[in-house]
Amino acid sequence: MRPLSVQSKFEDVATSTSVNHHGVTPQSPWHSPVPYLFGGLAAMLGLIAFALLILACSYWRLSSSGEEDGQNVDEEKESRSGDKAANGAYEEKFLVIMAGEDLPRYLATPAMKKCTCGGHEGKMVISQEESVAKEEEKMREGEEEKVKDTGETTTTSH
């Protein structure tokens, strides 16, 4: 006769699961990209919130300093005007990059051409002030000569 072996079902399940666990290691949740995605998103939102907090605090500080009785406002204006005077020389300079290997970068100050056309409204004046004055003198001399020749007086409005 055959020997009878009686085993319960629970023992079979226990032995079969233990065999499967020995061959496969359990997978860590950090092997998935999802935690890294949400972690990066949380870090980015945290940095944005921190920047907004700093911006709000600086705005609050500026608005509260303007509400004072004006005790320190004059001192701040004086210090700001001193800063402007110190930075005035550098304020109107531009970086110019030129072609070449020797000193290709310069700080350039923009030059404005001054208009010398005070009394010549609507006319194009190309000459300098001295030559304009000479031309006006010649015109006056020409008018005086005409007056002497004709003997009549003319009025000129300047």
Curated annotation (Swiss-Prot):
Annotated tissue distribution: Expressed in the vascular tissues and in hydathodes. Expressed in the phloem and xylem (at the protein level).
Ranges of biased composition (kind: Basic and acidic residues): 131-151
Free-text description of this protein's post-translational modifications in UniProt: Ubiquitinated by LOG2 (in vitro).
Sequence ranges on the Extracellular membrane side: 1-36
Subcellular location: Cell membrane
Membrane topology: Single-pass membrane protein
Keyword Heme assigned: no
GO cellular component, one term: plasma membrane
Protein name per its UniProtKB record: Protein GLUTAMINE DUMPER 1
Protein source organism: Arabidopsis thaliana (Mouse-ear cress)
Record gene name: GDU1
